[in-house]
């Protein structure tokens, strides 16, 4: 059974994770989200079966999505992690998990 996931951020790291997820065959990449139009266009070409979006909230609102991959900039991760927790999603995230040590401790707490 594949794990249904939504990816947020399709820059260099998001593409790397996408590629490895594709290779593993264990993931159903349901969504790819990026605010950059060029990144969304690339995602459309590479992953035609994924829904390509610019609003990450769609991923958090979709109850069928089991996990979220957070590969956007670190300054957005604290809020994204909090949304994922509230949405009962498993979290895969690039490091660091936040852009300041104080925000990292807030996440841990």
Question: What are the language-model segments listed below?
Answer:
Residues 50-108:
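Beta-loop-alpha module in the N-terminal Rossmann-like domain of NAD(P)-dependent dehydrogenases
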Residues 41-45, 58, 109:
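Charged/polar, solvent-exposed surface patches and flexible loops
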Residues 1-47:
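N-terminal Rossmann-like dinucleotide-binding module
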């Amino acid at each position: 059974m594949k794990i249904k996931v939504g990816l947020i951020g399709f820059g260099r790291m998001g593409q790397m994770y996408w590629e490895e997820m594709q290779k593993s065959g264990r993931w159903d990449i349901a969504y790819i989200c990026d605010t950059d139009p060029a990144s969304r266009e690339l995602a459309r070409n590479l992953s035609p079966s994924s829904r390509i979006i610019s609003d990450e909230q769609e991923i958090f609102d979709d109850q069928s999505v089991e996990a979220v991959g957070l590969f956007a900039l670190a300054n957005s991760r604290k809020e994204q992690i909090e949304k994922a927790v509230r949405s009962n999603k498993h979290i895969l995230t690039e490091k660091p998990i936040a852009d300041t040590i104080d925000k990292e401790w807030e996440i841990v707490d």
